[in-house]
Amino acid sequence: VENRAGYIQDQLQQAQELTDLSTYINETTQQMLDDETLSLKTLDSSSSDSLPLLLAAAPRMLETLRSKRISGIFLILNTHDFTGRTSGDRLPCVYLRDLDPDAAPSVVNSDILLECAPSELVQTFDIATDKAWSPALQYLDGEQDVFYVRPFQTAYEDNERMGAANYGRWTTLPYKLLGDDHEAIAYAQPLILDDGTVYGVLGVELLESYIDTKLPWDELQNDHHGSYLLASTTSDLKGEVLALHVTSNTGEQSVPLQNAKWELTLQRSNNCWYYMMDGKQQIASIRQIGLYSRNAPFSGERWLLVGVVGKNDLFSFSQ
């Protein structure tokens, strides 16, 4: 579990490193504001007003998608307080997806899909649209919006204005895009100009199906019993009880966890973590995954990789 946790931590940290891309987008935005190609008053009101910025950002986003082991990348423009928005509002957006990031990239980008982008960008960018393609991202005021709303709103409401990456957050709940059946988690951070204006969100996506390939549960025990859980908690890791929210999982615990609505409570006994599932004791090994700096707004959401093997399976060799 320790080695696998180190590997997952490296993957997630590499995915969330967006400094170069966010700097480019911020500088491009500022230049377009200075020469009046863009206006902050209308930036998020229609795709045509934001089109110059989306057209400039999209090629760099594609480069970043290619250079990282991620399944998606997105840019969402918004200059307004989300608490004042209504369900159905449309936000200018470019959302690119690669269903198989580990495969050799196509020279003509035939492996990339546009989930969301204005039709003018689709025509010039020469990338196919997915079946649920939309010209703008529809704000629905629900769980499916949390992946981009939380980082934006936290920065928007913070008068101190830290660096944008400090507001970055990984979603603890998988989401689906409207009309799409792929479950994903995302890391998103706000876009902030030098004067403190928060004008959008930049982020990366990892499909649940892709994360599963990075959690080979059969390595946990020789007889191919066990499960990996990628989870988060706000509990004290030094305590005797851990309330977990499971974000991704592979192995034998998938169905029972689904029935438990992905919530799990671990107890500690003799320095060993365990929980009961369907009347059987499961032994858990836990390693923390460091994703946030200590003072970041979401540092209280601690990420863990949990390896699980049933007690009977774990000790079967000695019986």
Protein language model annotation of sequence segments:
Residues Q9, E27, P59-K68, L178-G179, ...:
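Short regulatory alpha-helical segment in sensory/regulatory domains of signaling proteins that mediates
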Residues C116-G203:
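Extracytoplasmic/periplasmic ligand-binding sensor regions of membrane-associated signaling proteins
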Residues L77-Q138, T233-D236, E240:
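GAF sensory/regulatory domain recognition
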Residues D181-V204, E208, T250-Q319:
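Extracellular/periplasmic juxtamembrane segments that couple receptor/chemosensory ectodomains to their
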Residues A56-M61, T197, V201-S248:
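Solvent-exposed, extracytoplasmic
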Residues L62, R69-F82, H225-A231:
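Short, hydrophobic-rich beta-strand element in sensory/regulatory alpha-beta domains
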Residues V1-A57, R69-S71:
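Juxtamembrane extracytoplasmic/periplasmic/luminal helical "stalk" adjacent to the first N-terminal
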Residues G72-R85, V94-R97, T154-Y175, E301-W303, ...:
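Tryptophan-centric aromatic hotspots in well-structured domains and transmembrane helices
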